[in-house]
Amino acid sequence: MRENRGWEVFSLLTSTEVYEERVVEVPEDVQLTIEGDSFRGYTLKAVGPKGENTRYLKYRGVFIEVGDGKVRVYTTSPKKKHKAMVGTFAGHIENLITGVKEGFEYHLKVVYAHFPIKVRVEGNEVIIENFIGEKHPRRAKIVGRAQVEISGQDIYVRGIDIEECGQTAANLEQATKIKRKDPRVFQDGIYIVKKP
């Protein structure tokens, strides 16, 4: 069984037929560098106007090449999983480039019917006080380098990493989840209203 697997990996490396390919354009104001290979994984580093970000991508049989202002992601395997990973890698690279060029922003709204919710940032946490009249404040973690800005009933989560911003926004939404009550009646909470 091991011999077959070895030949399979060898054939991936030596095969010249490309079964799936995606090309991602790199803007002029973004510098993208790549290190590694398909076996050890690729470390992509993007530097742009908003800052710099890195991403580690690894899937054997999926190859990444950078050159001439383009990133080429392709596979020499006819398998569905390899073809699917080409699209996944291309999506991650696009998000990496967009993050350092424009950044990402999630817009959330604080909604309450009776008890006014007080929201404030404290260190790497968002403190939610007086939620449905609770005495104990609820907390939501700010992930990584995401920035949280509170403006009245609006909360903005900004950053260059879409996963950090998305997880921070999700943490805020989950922190105000009401359990064991009718959600049609108790609609207080913090809700994502706009995603990037």
From Swiss-Prot:
Superkingdom, taxonomy of origin: Archaea
Signal peptide region: none
SUPFAM superfamilies listed in its UniProt record: Ribosomal protein L6
Keywords of the record: Ribonucleoprotein, Ribosomal protein, RNA-binding, rRNA-binding
Membrane-spanning residues: none
InterPro entries referenced in this protein's UniProt entry, alphabetically: Ribosomal_uL6-like, Ribosomal_uL6-like_a/b-dom_sf, Ribosomal_uL6_a/b-dom, Ribosomal_uL6_arc, Ribosomal_uL6_CS2
Record's GO cellular component terms: cytosolic large ribosomal subunit
GO biological process: cytoplasmic translation
A GO molecular-function annotation: structural constituent of ribosome
UniProt subunit comment: Part of the 50S ribosomal subunit.
Protein family (similarity comment): Belongs to the universal ribosomal protein uL6 family.
Function statement: This protein binds to the 23S rRNA, and is important in its secondary structure. It is located near the subunit interface in the base of the L7/L12 stalk, and near the tRNA binding site of the peptidyltransferase center.
Name of this protein: Large ribosomal subunit protein uL6
Organism: Archaeoglobus fulgidus (strain ATCC 49558 / DSM 4304 / JCM 9628 / NBRC 100126 / VC-16)
